[in-house]
Each structure stands twice: as C-alpha cells, then as structure tokens.
C-alpha cells in the first residue's frame, strides 16, 4: 500500500568496512526496484603484497611520481601518537588544502581530536617531509583487521610539483 514516499536515499558504508561483509540489505532493496545511484568507494588496494612487489603493483604514473619524489629527497614517516605540534600542522595543511578546493573539512578540529582521543588505536597519521618540513599528510582509520579508510589526505600546494601524494598512498 502507498504511504506517500517516492524516494529513499541511503549511504551505507562500503561493504569492506565491515568485519563480516554482507549485502543482504542491498540485495533486498535492488530486488524491490531500488537502484544504486552512486558508490562511495573509489579505490581498493590489496595490502598482502610483499613489500618488494608493492611498487610494481601501482600504475605507471604513480610509480614514476613515487620514484621522482624519492630522488628529490622526500621522506615518509608514520606518526603513531601525534604531538600537539604535529596535530596543529595536520590541521593547518588540511584547512589550507580544502580552502584551495573551495570546501572545508567534513569534520571540525574538535571532532577530529575527539575521535583521536576515543579510538587512538584505530587512527594513524603519516606525513611526507621535505627538508625537515611536513608538506603532505594522510590520516587513516582502521575499520577492521583487513580494511583501512583514508580519512583525510592533504598537501601544501607550493610543494605539489614534488609529487608528495604518491608517497602516502
């Protein structure tokens, strides 16, 4: 019977974010005529590749950018427990990067710090440094034992020519 609803919008998390992937809801909705308008997962990367084969698994453009960044002296560093100064730098680069795209971060700084304080074991920050200065960063969220969500990635525009982002991905 008709209850006056002609459209429902759902944004479920990608199935790989679940500890036990299942798609019963997707199947049931599609069987009733619903359709997927857009999917949020843009890329998935296998992480069980031996480290010495990892670079070879990337597309040529990414491999070239990675090698160039390496030759230019960029350094990759994982930050397990960010200091306040590193958190400040993360926020500064993120806000500047998003402003250049005409947007603001989806979360405010207070929310990000709260998340970090609630589940620090699920969060990982990594940075790319050039001449001792953080120029690019990524903040990852461990969804489960098999999946890591790239929560935020940003770089400083003046250093884009050094191609720091492939170092983070």
What label would you give each PLM region?
Residues 1, 160-169:
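Conserved acetyl-CoA-binding loop-helix of GNAT-fold acetyltransferases
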Residues 2-3, 118:
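Alpha-helix C-cap/termination motif
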Residues 3-15:
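Conserved GNAT acetyl-CoA-binding A-motif
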Residues 12-161:
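A conserved beta-strand-loop-helix scaffold within acyl/acetyltransferase catalytic domains
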């Amino acid at each position: 019977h008709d209850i006056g609803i002609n459209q429902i919008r759902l944004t479920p998390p990608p199935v790989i974010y679940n500890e036990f992937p299942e798609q019963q809801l997707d199947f049931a909705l599609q069987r009733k005529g619903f359709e997927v308008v857009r999917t949020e997962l843009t890329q998935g990367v296998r992480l069980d590749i031996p480290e010495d084969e990892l670079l070879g698994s990337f597309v040529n453009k990414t491999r070239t950018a990675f090698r160039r960044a390496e030759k230019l002296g960029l350094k990759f560093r994982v930050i397990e427990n960010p200091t306040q100064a590193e958190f400040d730098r993360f926020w500064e680069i993120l806000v500047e990067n998003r402003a250049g795209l005409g947007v603001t971060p989806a979360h405010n700084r207070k929310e990000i710090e709260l998340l970090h304080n609630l589940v620090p074991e699920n969060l990982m920050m990594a940075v790319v440094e050039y001449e001792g200065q953080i120029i690019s960063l990524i903040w990852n969220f461990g969804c489960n034992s098999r999946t890591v969500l790239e929560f935020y990635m940003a770089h400083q525009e003046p250093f884009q020519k050094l191609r720091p982002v492939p170092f983070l991905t």
